[in-house]
Amino acid sequence: MVKIRLRRAGRKKLPVYQIVAADARAPRDGKFLEVIGHYQPTAKPHAITLDKERVAYWLGVGAQPTTTAHSLIRATGLLHEMNMKRKGRSEEEIAAEMEQWQARQNERREKRLAIKTRRRQAKKAAEAEGQESA
């Protein structure tokens, strides 16, 4: 069985992962069939690059993504795009839907970032207030 999974590269404490198609019996960093993308978790925001045609090919021939690889593929919108193609939508409809999808993802990302910054500011204010009263 072929799996789409992550293969660790990079140096100590600075991981970079290759997204590969590999035999399920092969070790994590061992033999693989093809590199189909890269993932840099330490970049802000996380950097994901995929060869969409090759990912679609491997999924089409029955490769099973691991949970992490599945979430990375989903984050790029490839699964949504493949699902629309499977349903028989035209290229124009797919392009329009993908633009809307990308806009929604950007809004969500900005909203999460705003919440995070508000929490940090509130925490700093609480710490400053606690130090003043002490």
Swiss-Prot record:
InterPro entries: Ribosomal_bS16 (IPR000307), Ribosomal_bS16_dom_sf (IPR023803). Residues 105-134 are annotated as: Disordered. Gene3D superfamilies: 3.30.1320.10. One of its GO terms (molecular function) is structural constituent of ribosome. Signal peptide: none annotated. Residues 114-123 have a biased composition (Basic residues). GO terms for cellular component: cytoplasm; small ribosomal subunit. Pfam families: Ribosomal_S16. Keywords: Ribonucleoprotein, Ribosomal protein. GO terms for biological process: translation. Belongs to the bacterial ribosomal protein bS16 family. NCBIfam families: S16 (TIGR00002). This is Small ribosomal subunit protein bS16. It comes from Chlorobium phaeobacteroides (strain BS1).
